[in-house]
Amino acid sequence: MATPLVAGPAALRFAAAASWQVVRGRCVEHFPRVLEFLRSLRAVAPGLVRYRHHERLCMGLKAKVVVELILQGRPWAQVLKALNHHFPESGPIVRDPKATKQDLRKILEAQETFYQQVKQLSEAPVDLASKLQELEQEYGEPFLAAMEKLLFEYLCQLEKALPTPQAQQLQDVLSWMQPGVSITSSLAWRQYGVDMGWLLPECSVTDSVNLAEPMEQNPPQQQRLALHNPLPKAKPGTHLPQGPSSRTHPEPLAGRHFNLAPLGRRRVQSQWASTRGGHKERPTVMLFPFRNLGSPTQVISKPESKEEHAIYTADLAMGTRAASTGKSKSPCQTLGGRALKENPVDLPATEQKENCLDCYMDPLRLSLLPPRARKPVCPPSLCSSVITIGDLVLDSDEEENGQGEGKESLENYQKTKFDTLIPTLCEYLPPSGHGAIPVSSCDCRDSSRPL
């Protein structure tokens, strides 16, 4: 078989699928590979997302790599080496024509703050244990969830810029990289397809099939992805675990894996100790779960505890209040899995229309609480205005609704024919095709499953 175009749309999608699995599975040890992919993509298609969006995601990935080394108890020499690699103290600043002065100022300040914070930790302060606990909390699950959402939006923009996926082209690339493996048997690829809203074929690919059309052509309603109708009539108890037969058709669960509710729907719920000794109010992501950590073949189960159930109910109530007061201006529909599970049919009409992908750019917008809404709970003298990487990742007050140049950028990229610039899935997998990226997430217990 002839070698497929390694920088074509199919290869880009496989690289995106691998990156998505790494971030989705919290595989911090592979974050540098995701950084490589994002930098390559930014170099050839700078218009996919705004500069600030790209930098927030990349800085978050780099910071998590360094923090993970610290929390694992690695030697400080190794930690500082990684710190200097990802955050060079006097490294050149990349001048992006799309970057504003405010963007550059915030990014530079966040990098410097993180660098000094790690340097101070390496000097063995007397309260090292409390500092490490604070670091673990600051770069914990809310931070990772915000990064995952940033990457999802990035990949959505990439998908909008690429042509319609063709199953045969995808199979050709996968067969070249992993002989004998079908796109229907690759868990990472199936998960990516489900999350991106495709209907993957259940059988082996024998001809060129348009993966976008079956959503309208497939007659069984239960086989359709809930993108344009994310709130179908639900039978009582549909969120409960079903028999083995329900696990063979993961497509109906697509709407339950994601909710594109903006990060603005969150509550400021805790104070965070700053690196300079004061206290500042720190936003925490409190949004409907926009995907399930399990594999696409898993069904959504009930919350594990009453406390968890209360959190979901509170978040649902927040969204309902926002919709009833008329503050939700986006004409998109909710895709939240557990929100749908808690109240599948009684959501207000405005809430049902909030997060639909029919909206041109609103699902990709991070609409957050304005700064003036955050009232300090400590004296002004104790409040720190230091911007950290965690602030930039969790906070997007100034995220603009103008990311729409991806199509032109990728067309220009295709004309340049830098065929080896974008890393492909080959670089994420062992050549045998039976290896796997170790999954560090507690929700992904099978670390031997293949991509």
UniProtKB/Swiss-Prot annotation:
Modified residues (N-acetylalanine): A2
Subcellular location: Nucleus; Chromosome, Telomere
Gene Ontology BP annotations: negative regulation of epithelial cell proliferation; negative regulation of telomere maintenance via telomerase; positive regulation of telomere maintenance; protein localization to chromosome, telomeric region; regulation of telomere maintenance via telomere lengthening; telomere assembly; telomere capping
Residue(s) of cross-link: Glycyl lysine isopeptide (Lys-Gly) (interchain with G-Cter in SUMO2): K302, K306, K341, K353
Pfam families (UniProt xref): TINF2_N (PF14973)
Residues that bear Phosphoserine: S295
UniProt entry tagged with the keyword Ubl conjugation: yes
Alphabetized UniProt keyword annotations: Acetylation, Chromosome, Disease variant, Dyskeratosis congenita, Isopeptide bond, Nucleus, Phosphoprotein, Telomere, Ubl conjugation
GO CC annotations on file: chromosome, telomeric region; nuclear body; nuclear matrix; nuclear telomere cap complex; nucleoplasm; perinucleolar chromocenter; shelterin complex
Ranges spanned by the short sequence motif Nuclear localization signal, renumbered to the chain: 262-268
UniProt tissue specificity: Detected in heart, brain, placenta, lung, liver, skeletal muscle, kidney and pancreas.
GO molecular function term, any single one: telomeric DNA binding
Annotated InterPro entries: TINF2 (IPR039098), TINF2_N (IPR029400)
Keyword Acetylation among record annotations: yes
Motif range (TBM): 256-278
Principal location listed in the UniProt entry: nucleus
Signal peptide positions (record): none
Location of region: Disordered: 229-257
Domain of life from the UniProt record: Eukaryota
PANTHER family: TERF1-INTERACTING NUCLEAR FACTOR 2
UniProt function note: Component of the shelterin complex (telosome) that is involved in the regulation of telomere length and protection. Shelterin associates with arrays of double-stranded TTAGGG repeats added by telomerase and protects chromosome ends; without its protective activity, telomeres are no longer hidden from the DNA damage surveillance and chromosome ends are inappropriately processed by DNA repair pathways. Plays a role in shelterin complex assembly. Isoform 1 may have additional role in tethering telomeres to the nuclear matrix.
Quaternary structure, from the entry: Monomer. Found in a complex with POT1; TERF1 and TNKS1. Component of the shelterin complex (telosome) composed of TERF1, TERF2, TINF2, TERF2IP ACD and POT1. Interacts with TERF1, TERF2 and ACD.
Illness association: Dyskeratosis congenita, autosomal dominant, 3: A rare multisystem disorder caused by defective telomere maintenance. It is characterized by progressive bone marrow failure, and the clinical triad of reticulated skin hyperpigmentation, nail dystrophy, and mucosal leukoplakia. Common but variable features include premature graying, aplastic anemia, low platelets, osteoporosis, pulmonary fibrosis, and liver fibrosis among others. Early mortality is often associated with bone marrow failure, infections, fatal pulmonary complications, or malignancy.
Entry remark concerning the domains of this protein: The TBM domain mediates interaction with TERF1.
Protein name: TERF1-interacting nuclear factor 2
Provenance organism: Homo sapiens
